[in-house]
Amino acid sequence: LSGVENVDPLSLPSVLSGVPALDSLIGGFYPSELSVWTGKRGGGKSTLLGQLLVEAVNQRQRVCAYSGELSAWRFREWIYLQAAGPAFIERKADKFSGREFYSVSPFARKKLDAWFARKFFLCDNSAPGGNSEDAICSLFSYAVRRYGCAVFLVDNLMSARFGASNDGDFYRGQSNFVGRLVEFAKREEVHVHLVAHPRKNDGKAMLDADEVGGSGDITNRADNVFSLQRLTEQ
């Protein structure tokens, strides 16, 4: 034990979230760690994690994301809207339905294209087998070797395919996949963010680590577990 290298925690590099209150509590997101994020549907998990990736790029880190819920173009638009900010977002209306939507201005889009180039990478979930755990892990490893990515996102655990034939196999598959992500984070000294939806909780207002759906190994293997909820005015 006495021969273990002495490391000053303050010297370890971390990627800040850009949320001062959160950064002051955890010191940022450190290499070789896995963070699990949970919360009710529509609570803002994907939005916040998209912002964390943008913040990482702003800190000269390269990032790689897997999204099992959004197509590539929808994921891109979501990230671009966040990165552009309100000054460079235009409100438009569909001439047939009247539905309003928001779009990044051409000026800002061109700037963001140049800013994100070779810094922000997205796994292609439309490719055959692109949502299997083997494909995700393989692409993540390639992103480290080829592009030097240091921050990763899996959004979300339920969208990955494990080849399970029953519930028991599915939960073991989830646990094994989380274990592979932990090993990947430690081996490559990167940080992995993982979105895991909570199980049904009969309207419970506050969610904790025990509310994460699937196997308990998901949170047991994580370095950080965060629960997001949308607060309403009382």
Task: Give each language-model segment a name.
Residues 24, 60-147:
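Cytosolic-facing regulatory segments adjacent to core modules
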Residues 25-28, 42, 78, 107, ...:
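Phosphate-binding/switch region of NTP-binding enzymes
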Residues 35-37, 64-66, 121-123, 193, ...:
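Hydrophobic/aromatic beta-strand patches that form the interior of the parallel beta-sheet core
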